[in-house]
Amino acid sequence: MNQRQKTSRRAVLKGLGASLALPFLPSLMPKGLLAQSAGATHQAPQRFAALFMPNGVHPGKWSPTKLGRDFELSPILQPLAKVQDKMLVLGGLSNKHSYRTVEGHYTKTGNFLTSMRVSRTVDADVNAGGISVDQVLAKHLGKHSVFPSLQYGLDRMKSGVCKSTGITRLYGSTISWESGRQPCSREIDPRMAFDRLFRDFVPGKKPLPHDPYKQSVLDIVMNDAKRLEKRIGVEDRNKLNEYLTSVRTIEKRLDNQASLKDFEARITPDVRKELQRMDIRIDEWAEFTEGVDITDKARLMVDIIVLAFWSDISRVATYMLGNSASGRNFSFLDGVNDSHHAISHHKYDPRQMAQYEIINRWHIEQYAYLLERLDSIKEGDGTLLDNSMILFGSGLRDGMRHSPKDLPIVVGGSGGGRLHTGSNVRYDADTPLANLYQTMLAATGSEVQGFGDSTGTLSDLLV
């Protein structure tokens, strides 16, 4: 059965070569069900996303100074001001299976969502210890959606062995695991991510004379959208138009991403040959090493996640804003003149630490963008953010010390009112990060017990 045919609770617009899942529209409910639900609140689905930031944080500029609800955001967390009452800053959480090893980055990324011991290996025989929490949630929350989970990133997956640690780089390229030995593949191209959700693929078929892939998805399904508008009420029509406008905006941004031809023209034949040998696209190399501003690309991925949650085509997503030990050049940010990983090894130089803070803040700005977008979309008596749990974190505290203790962790949203929010909470030292994951599982009604190295839930967070 075509995976898209699973969708029944929400409408799908269709056209030749594309389909577009829609948000929940009460006007489309059968009259009998609509009558039964009169006076009752539509039960919105829960969503979960995890955003990963590599290379840790500036330790002195991350944590708010006050605990409880009356806390002031730290300099790095300032971009979250608009959603402060809908988020949690959590301190003291540690990933013990990360610090029982001398490796600095890769194992601390590979087990970020598994909280299990990572096997040291130099080849593709990887083992992250077990399934990641997003995949547990995908089996629970995502079993009724078209795509049980989505995995996105900004950096291409890396293979080979890290010379300084003698461990495979594969661990640094994924946080999502179907099982300990099976990492989930990621999409790093916004166009491919968008098309995978909203275009129909027909393997082995020749392109149609009028290739639908050259058309806007919205243009393809517009006739169906116009027919639907005649069947729904004014409120739902406004909701539909808001959603379709968002789709159109993303398509335009995908088509208008900045050209990298100038960088390509400056690449020497020797470098071009080496890039071909390494099988890396020229524009990708330039983007990573030449300080190209990737903010819009990063936010395109965010907007695609928002569309997926909004339309209920998926309820679970992970998004890596960089691979472990990412050396992306962040000189597109004012005040930064070097690569992320190099700056994270700041040696307590005030100039380096100032740049480190700027890079950290950029990552939080992308997280804040996601939370604000979700919070802007009404759903039932609340918003998409209210019905979500959006994790942000890194696998280590400080890039200089590589410590996976007192990890930088934020959670946005209450999971449909299951979590208390609006506080800065600090737990006893070495409280397992897995206790947060066990808490999130409990908030969704999952019956999974003893996730990772958890010793219980963070019961003070549960409503």
What are the functions of these language-model segments?
Residues 1-463:
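Ligand-binding pockets and gating/stacking loops
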